[in-house]
Amino acid sequence: MVIMEYNGKTPKISNNSYVSPMSTIIGDVVINDNVIIWPGSIIRGENSQINIGEYSTIFDGVILLTRSQKSPIHIGRYCILETGATLLGGFLEDYVQIMEGSLIFEETSIGEGAVILNKSQVPPGLVVPARVVMKGIPVEIIRQQSRNDVLEQKERAHHYTQLFIKIKDLLPNAESYLLTLPDFVKFLLKKEI
C-alpha cells in the first residue's frame, strides 16, 4: 500500500479499518472506523480533504480525487462506492450508493439513501435529493426510495464490514488472500462463514 504525505498532510487511517496493500492514499485523507478500501483504489487528498465515514466500503479501482480547494470529498457513514466509480469532489450523506463506473463531479451534494446507477454522471454543483435512484448522463431521477430501501442499503454496507471482520479473524494474514475481488469471492465460496 502506498501512503504518502503531501503538502504537510499525512493520511489518518483508523486501526479498525482495512486498507488493501494494493491501494494508494495521498495527503489530507481521513479514514474512519470500520471502513474497507479494496485493491486498486486511489484516494488523493492533495488539494482538499477526503473524509470517509464509518462502515463505508470503497471497492476495487475507485478513484477519489480533490482537484481544487473547492472540491473536498465527504463520504458519509454506510456508503458503498462500487468498482470503478470516480468522485472529483462532493458531499455524500449517509447510506449513499454509487454504482459501478459512475462519475461524480465537483461541488455536488448527494442526499441520504440516494443511489446513482451504473455508468451515470452527476454534473458539477448538482444537489441530489435524499432517497432517490438516478441514472444517465447527466443523471435523472428514475424512482423514489422507501425508508426500507435505505435501511437495506445500511445493512448491505454493514454486511461488507462484518464479513471482512469474520474473514480476518479466520485468517491471521487475510491481506494476502484478499488482493483482488475475484480472489475474495473464490474464498467466500469455499468457506462457510
Q: Regions from the language model: what does each represent?
A:
Residues 1-30, 34, 42, 192-193:
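Extended, small-residue-rich solenoid/repeat segments and analogous flexible loops
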Residues 17-18, 37-38, 77, 98:
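Short Cys/His-rich Zn2+-coordinating modules
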